[in-house]
UniProtKB/Swiss-Prot annotation:
Pfam families: LRR_14 (PF23598), LRR_8 (PF13855). The gene is Lrrc39. Component of the sarcomeric M-band which plays a role in myocyte response to biomechanical stress. May regulate expression of other M-band proteins via an SRF-dependent pathway. Important for normal contractile function in heart. LRR repeats lie at residues 84-105, 107-128, 130-152, 153-176, 177-198, 200-221, 223-244, 246-267, 269-290. Expressed in heart and skeletal muscle. This is Leucine-rich repeat-containing protein 39. The keyword Transcription does not apply. The keyword Chloroplast does not apply. Interacts with MYH7 (via C-terminus). Transmembrane segments: none annotated. It comes from Mus musculus (Mouse). Its main location: cytoplasm. It is found in: Cytoplasm, Myofibril, Sarcomere, M line.
Length: 337
């Protein structure tokens, strides 16, 4: 073996040793950084947990986490150490998402995360079988997961002012205890089938959507006593509305109604109705009243107005029928002479 070959082999061996050492050094540095980052995360979680604990109160026997107007874009996993919480009240915190571990808070009764920037509801929400109220209004939610139907204790659901929700999964009809539903200021073009099939629903707000017509099956909501449909594009009301025997409040202001169906006279439980700002084909003026307060102003297009309109509509129809029959009558008289 020549001297140069020996020298080359020695250099290669030294090079391998140094490369191995450099590689090991880089790995050690990487592990050290990861360890430091882990320590930082642990420390931050502890600090966050300490801050969160300061926000926990007990009111009326409930353990409540209440945060208002403080920045919490995400919630740390250390929050799981407070899994006995029964109520979350987090408003105007900039919260971007509901944590995936939400399903582990089995004692939650109220989850109010309104006025944040949440874009989706995690499927784990369906694990909250004790949840009675879910308030997610004023967020950026576009869809609702079918897993929400597993929240079998849910009584109140508010999704108002998310602006982009246009439908609900049919599985939500399984929410047998839901009595209150707010879907106002979204993009619904019709009342979802899931809503029509909610057996206990008593209060529904679908104002400020894009509803153009109401389904004939509207009367399936037999328990409904309050229905808000203001600021839509509704052009007519189905005859089946007369079957909604429990309906006491009906708001239809700012729509495109041209008529009020006579069958609404049969709705004897109706106590408040509003037809203001609709292009109704008949002009009806109520008799003057001494009362000049705000309630009287509302009544101008309220229950008394509705009954007066229906009566006027019938009178107009009778007059038209009379006029259409008159020529044939005159013709008959002429033949008899």
């Amino acid at each position: 073996m020549t001297e140069s070959a020996v020298c080359t082999g020695a250099v290669s061996a030294v090079k391998e040793v140094w490369e191995e050492r450099i590689k090991k050094h880089h790995e050690d540095v990487k592990r050290e950084k990861e360890f430091q980052h882990k320590l930082v995360r642990i420390w931050e979680d502890r600090v966050s947990l300490t801050k969160l604990k300061e926000k926990v109160t007990r009111e009326d026997g409930r353990v409540i986490l209440r945060i208002e107007k403080e920045e919490w874009k995400t919630l740390p996993s250390s929050l799981l150490k407070l899994n006995q919480l029964q109520e979350w009240q987090l408003h105007r915190t900039g919260l971007l998402k509901i944590p995936e571990f939400i399903g582990r808070f089995q004692h939650l009764i109220v989850l109010d995360l309104s006025r944040n920037t949440i874009s989706e509801i995690p499927r784990g929400i369906g694990l909250l079988t004790r949840l009675q109220e879910l308030i997610l209004s004023y967020n950026k939610i576009k869809t609702v997961p079918k897993e929400l139907s597993n929240c079998t204790s849910l009584e109140k659901l508010e999704l108002a002012v998310n602006r982009d929700i246009s439908d609900l999964p049919p599985e939500l009809s399984k929410l047998l205890k839901l009595t209150h539903l707010d879907l106002s200021m979204n993009q619904f073009t019709t009342i979802p089938h899931a809503v029509l099939d909610m057996p206990a629903l008593e209060w529904l707000d679908m104002g400020s959507n894009s509803l153009q017509q109401l389904p004939d099956s509207l009367d399936r909501m037999r328990s409904l006593h309050t229905l808000w449909l203001q600021r839509n594009e509704i052009t007519c009301l189905p005859e089946t509305i007369k079957n909604m025997k429990n309906l006491g409040t009906l708001v239809l202001s700012n729509n495109k109604l041209q008529d009020i169906p006579g069958c609404m006279e049969e709705m004897t439980n109706l106590r408040f109705v509003n037809f203001r700002d609709n292009p109704l084909r008949l002009e009806v003026t109520l008799p003057p009243s001494d009362n000049t307060d705000g309630e009287e102003e509302q009544e101008l297009f309220g229950l008394q107005f509705m009954h007066a309109y229906i009566q006027e509509s019938r009178r107009t129809e009778d007059q038209v029928n009379c006029l259409t029959q008159m020529p044939s009558s005159i013709h008959s008289d002429g033949e008899s002479n």
